[in-house]
UniProtKB/Swiss-Prot annotation:
GO molecular function, one term: ATP binding
Protein name: 26S proteasome regulatory subunit S10B homolog B
UniProt gene name: RPT4B
InterPro entries (alphabetical): 26S_Proteasome_ATPase, AAA+_ATPase, AAA_lid_3, ATPase_AAA_core, ATPase_AAA_CS, NA-bd_OB-fold, P-loop_NTPase, Prot_ATP_ID_OB_2nd
Membership in a protein family: Belongs to the AAA ATPase family.
Assembly, per entry: Component of the 19S regulatory particle (RP/PA700) base subcomplex of the 26S proteasome. The 26S proteasome is composed of a core protease (CP), known as the 20S proteasome, capped at one or both ends by the 19S regulatory particle (RP/PA700). The RP/PA700 complex is composed of at least 17 different subunits in two subcomplexes, the base and the lid, which form the portions proximal and distal to the 20S proteolytic core, respectively.
Signal sequence segment: none
Annotated SMART domains: AAA
UniProt xrefs under Pfam families: AAA (PF00004), AAA_lid_3 (PF17862), Prot_ATP_ID_OB_C (PF16450)
Cellular component terms per the entry's GO annotation: cytoplasm; nucleolus; nucleus; plant-type cell wall; plasmodesma; proteasome complex
């Protein structure tokens, strides 16, 4: 019996000892894990400190511009500080890229060309490129079938199939002017073209180009066209072109003269790029009668496309496009709504849908009925009477 008790005690002691050692092992594992994390953090801190020390000890480099190559090994470079040097080139740098006007990095001590830099881009031009035109299909533009066809022939066809023009022996249009009353879809058309073509899109608000310093506005125009040439295919869309494209006159303030200099630079750039090149220009305005004749001549803006107020059929198409995403209940008589909306443009028709939705929300409904649309069109018809159409000359371009 005593042997059995001894065996039980030894077993209990062994189990207790095992548990203690297991707990001790887990504790050691936890300590090792913590130590590894601390080591990892210390290594990270060490590497960061080492990088900081290197950056403090490193010598800056000079930015220069290649004027012209002398031979296979040496080039004439103008440093940013002003003086000119004859310098060599690092073996890893591609010498074919070092053409006149290329920005380069020069070593502080030896003035050797270390690497080539991309062209300097004005932040204003850079921001133009990064404006998203949105995902707009041609089917979202209602009532403008002929205008879409003409615009695609002028802009999309030369970019996608330039060989068609070469085969026929004609020169494609360089640029297109979209003109018409406000709210008829000029900007929407340009955005639809941009989202359906795999090309860079520069959206320019003409009034934003004007700068108070003499020559800055013209420099922006030059940089914009240079950037477009380097990033072909590219579409430049200049909205509200009447801000800089108005008729020139002899008298005026210094601000007027700056606008005229900007226009002359724009005309010069329009003459400068190749017609078969992959840079196309779209301009939009609702004041075509004030534009300078030099801007409108063929060879600069070859096609003038009028975007008129929609007729009854076009209004029906536009209204159905805007109403397609609205939760509706019952039959909607679009024909009656369109008849009441005589003289409405595309923006007004979109506003009808918004106002109809507001009437539904006011009635605590989550759907729109026909009566909401009728109330909305009557309300907007009253507001429409306050608008004036005197700013748009409907006779422009008609003989």
């Amino acid at each position: 019996m005593s042997d059995g008790d001894d065996a039980a005690r030894r077993r209990t002691a062994a189990v207790t000892d095992y548990r203690k050692k297991l707990l001790h092992h887990k504790e050691l594992e936890s300590r090792v894990r913590t130590a590894r994390e601390n080591l990892r953090a210390a290594k990270k801190e060490f590497n960061k400190t080492e990088d900081d020390l290197k950056s403090l000890q490193s010598v800056g480099q000079i930015i220069g511009e290649v004027l012209r190559p002398l031979d296979n090994e040496r080039l004439i470079v103008k440093a940013s500080s002003g003086p000119r040097y004859v310098v060599g080139c690092r073996s890893k740098v591609d010498k074919e890229k070092l053409t006149s006007g290329t920005r380069v990095v020069l070593d502080m001590t030896t003035l050797t060309i270390m690497r080539a830099l991309p062209r300097e881009v004005d932040p204003v031009v850079y921001n133009m490129l990064h404006e998203d035109p949105g995902n707009i299909s041609y089917s979202a533009v209602g009532g403008l079938g002929d205008q879409i066809r003409e615009l695609r022939e002028s802009i999309e066809l030369p970019l996608m199939n330039p060989e068609l023009f070469l085969r026929v022996g004609i020169k494609p249009p360089k640029g297109v002017l979209l003109y018409g009353p406000p709210g008829t879809g000029k900007t929407l058309l340009a955005r639809a073209i941009a989202s359906n073509i795999d090309a860079n899109f520069l959206k320019v608000v003409s009034s934003a180009i004007i700068d108070k310093y003499i020559g800055e506005s013209a420099r922006l125009i030059r940089e914009m066209f240079n950037y477009a040439r380097e990033h072909q295919p590219c579409i430049i869309f200049m909205d509200e072109i009447d801000a800089i494209g108005g008729r020139r006159f002899s008298e005026g303030t210094s601000a007027d003269r700056e606008i005229q200099r900007t226009l002359m630079e724009l005309l010069n750039q329009l003459d400068g790029f190749d017609q078969l090149g992959k840079v196309k220009m779209i301009m939009a305005t609702n004041r075509p009668d004030v534009l300078d004749p030099a801007l409108l001549r063929p060879g600069r803006l070859d096609r003038k496309i009028e975007i008129p107020l929609p007729n009854e059929q076009s209004r029906m198409e536009i209204l159905k496009i805007h109403a397609s995403g609205i939760a509706k209940h019952g039959e909607i008589d679009y024909e009656a709504i369109v008849k009441l909306g005589e003289g409405f443009n595309g923006a007004d028709l979109r506003n009808i849908c918004t106002e109809a939705g507001m009437f539904a929300i006011r009635a605590e409904r989550d759907y729109v009925i026909h009566e909401d649309f009728m109330k909305a069109v009557r309300k907007l018809s009253e507001a429409k009477k306050l608008e004036s159409s005197s700013h748009y000359n409907a006779d422009f371009g008609k003989e």
